[in-house]
């Protein structure tokens, strides 16, 4: 049993945009409270995936318990729950916020408020969290704390008179932050005697002990000898151990309301202990689960194929293992005439897709070909049924379908005023519908647009950063489906349809996209000994075509002068060979060609 009374527990998280110093601040808090000895300290202590350290982002949630002696001489338990800052992982963020009573809002004193910070702040306000503004990086020469305070007050409406200036790098202001957490974050509700409910805010897969679940006890208590029931998945488990993260796992006998801990119960896969599920006791279950549980739905799909056919079983095993620790990843087998066997995978967003792909290549040593990402389309058939299509190649024939609907998102882009025109141009190109424009401060603006998700998942983010020299940031959420004039654009290479290059585009853009695509492929596919026609088609109608000319071997090199009929015979023989080659020959399409769909920046 941990001995902290509920009144001396503080649960808080850190909200920050990528690169505003969240993980560094977490490091300093751990160091200042003596939770991690100075000699054990390494940068970004809570980001324990190599990929997280390299990209400087937090992907999986972590939690750490710190003991802190406050100014009043009492010892407090501070539970820091780390949150991912990226838009793809917003569901995980919302669950971790539910486990807290307060949040540190970290804003870079030289850059100001960014889109993802805002999205998370609104989530925190919905959960009634006490928000403490922290201005980080005040040791930088470009820092302007007064301007940033005004900005936070203008945009979020928070009172910044008590904002804490700090530098997580040097440790300046960290003791004040710890004291502010004790003074300003409310203690958890004292609900020890109520029926047991605990919220799962994260889980990860341990190859030896099964799934380790991180949870926050909302009411009641959990003992290490209890049998528990997970209310959403209806599964029951006998606990092997429970404990606290300090920040390494430490076993305890019991945890009560307000505390944060972990449990191990030989759970086979993360999908059995979903983030947001409610843990209760089997012999005295709660009447209803905690609110807000939803299953993470994939938004972006792509095909993953091994470059070598014999790696297919390895890819399947790697995906199975990854799914144990990533419940949002979905996959099913698919075959393609051009690529052989592979998998169709579903992801939360583009970043999630990149991370999964990188982990497969890095941790499982696989060489992969990845097709261009697509979204889920809703196809209304003539017979009145609805079909959901996540692979453009499987779109039903035009004769059978009545209309196609595509997902739309509402997007907010935050950027300096100077880049207004460039951003509006980009949104216009991507079939965006203008909703509103708000001036946050005299030189920063918010653009609000509605766009088709398909236009966002390709290279929208890269383009936005390029056109604004990296200053813009965006945040979007799904708002539903809308009917549009959409067609399937097929690419034929040497007369054969290349499934991975099939895309669904708006009818008005089809010709330009088709033309740009075949031109791009012409650059990327190496020349062969025979001529390769490249065509883009809608149904049976070819809308754009070009061809890669053959490499010609000079068969007349050995003929010095002499009879013309001899030369004709050799040329005829060569033409015959090329004809046979063209009929039999397979064209090797390099990986870059499959990503060509993404890089059609020159298409309007």
Swiss-Prot record:
Membrane topology: Peripheral membrane protein
Coiled coil (residue ranges): none
Cellular compartment(s): Cell inner membrane
SMART domains: EFG_C
The tr-type G domain, residue ranges: 7-189
GO cellular component, one term: plasma membrane
Documented EC number(s): 3.6.5.n1
Keyword Repeat: no
Gene Ontology biological process terms from the UniProt entry: positive regulation of translation; translation
GO MF, any single term: GTP binding
UniProt key word Electron transport: no
Residues the entry annotates as binding GTP: 19-24, 136-139
Top-rank taxon, per record: Bacteria
Record-linked InterPro entries: EF-4, EFG_III/V, EFG_V-like, EFTu-like_2, G_TR_CS, GUFP, LepA_C_sf, LepA_CTD
Keywords: Cell inner membrane, Cell membrane, GTP-binding, Hydrolase, Membrane, Nucleotide-binding, Protein biosynthesis
Catalytic reactions of this protein: GTP + H2O = GDP + phosphate + H(+)
Pfam families (alphabetical): EFG_C (PF00679), GTP_EFTU (PF00009), GTP_EFTU_D2 (PF03144), LepA_C (PF06421)
UniProt function note: Required for accurate and efficient protein synthesis under certain stress conditions. May act as a fidelity factor of the translation reaction, by catalyzing a one-codon backward translocation of tRNAs on improperly translocated ribosomes. Back-translocation proceeds from a post-translocation (POST) complex to a pre-translocation (PRE) complex, thus giving elongation factor G a second chance to translocate the tRNAs correctly. Binds to ribosomes in a GTP-dependent manner.
Family classification: Belongs to the TRAFAC class translation factor GTPase superfamily. Classic translation factor GTPase family. LepA subfamily.
Protein name stated in the entry: Elongation factor 4
Gene that this sequence comes from: lepA
